[in-house]
């Protein structure tokens, strides 16, 4: 786990319903976020990563959606249409936002998050966990352990409530 300087992109992308959404402002806002990177034709590691994300999501089911967002970002946007993302999410029983978009926009977004690889097949599993309201992010390399994701998210929630009675807003 390495602490990371992450700037979430706010370019227009599409979620799995085909709706145009901006990642930083519309999806994440000032919530705590867990981001992973997938592509739908990936048969090896992505279904595993997504299943682990789903387990983490279950463990955090008591946390309000106002406080927590899970996001899966496509690293193969030319192939990953919203319809394919919907299918991929359904197979994985993943109940969160999947994002794709124009290749150039997605590539820039991935570069911004340090998650770009020229060949999706080669991408090493990596997730980003952080609090968008404080900019406190970590990168986790390798397959994410659901318990670790849960611990990290709860730690961020705790830091928020310490910060000021449960509402952390930047002034």
Feature names for model-found ranges:
Residues 1-25, 51:
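N-terminal "domain-start" segment that seeds a small globular fold
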Residues 6-8, 28-32, 65-68, 80, ...:
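Extracytoplasmic
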Residues 9, 95-96, 107, 113-127:
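Structural micro-motif
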Residues 14, 97-101:
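Short acidic-hydrophobic, aromatic-tinged amphipathic segments that line or gate anion-handling sites
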Residues 23-53:
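Short active-site neighborhood of thiol/selenol oxidoreductases, capturing the structured segment around
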Residues 38, 46, 57-64, 110-113, ...:
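Sec/Tat-exported extracytoplasmic proteins
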Residues 48-94, 103-112:
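Structural microenvironment flanking redox-active thiols in thiol-disulfide oxidoreductases
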Residues 122-171:
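Thiol-/selenol-based redox modules, centered on thioredoxin-like
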């Amino acid at each position: 786990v390495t602490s990371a300087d992450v700037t979430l992109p706010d370019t227009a992308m599409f979620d799995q319903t085909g709706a145009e959404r901006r990642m930083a402002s519309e999806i994440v806002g000032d919530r705590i976020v867990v981001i992973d990177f997938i592509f739908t034709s990936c048969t090896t590691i992505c279904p595993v990563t997504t299943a682990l994300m789903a387990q983490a999501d279950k463990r955090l089911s008591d946390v309000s959606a106002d406080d927590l967002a899970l996001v899966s970002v496509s690293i193969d946007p030319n192939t990953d249409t919203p319809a394919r993302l919907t299918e991929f999410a359904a197979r994985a029983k993943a109940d969160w936002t999947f994002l794709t978009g124009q290749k150039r926009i997605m590539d820039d977004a991935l570069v911004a998050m340090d998650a770009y690889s020229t060949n999706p097949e080669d991408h090493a599993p990596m997730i980003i966990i952080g609090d968008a309201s404080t900019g406190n992010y970590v990168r986790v390399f390798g397959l994410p352990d659901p318990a670790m994701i849960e611990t990290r998210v709860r730690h961020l929630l705790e830091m928020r409530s310490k910060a000021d009675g449960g509402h952390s807003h930047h002034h």
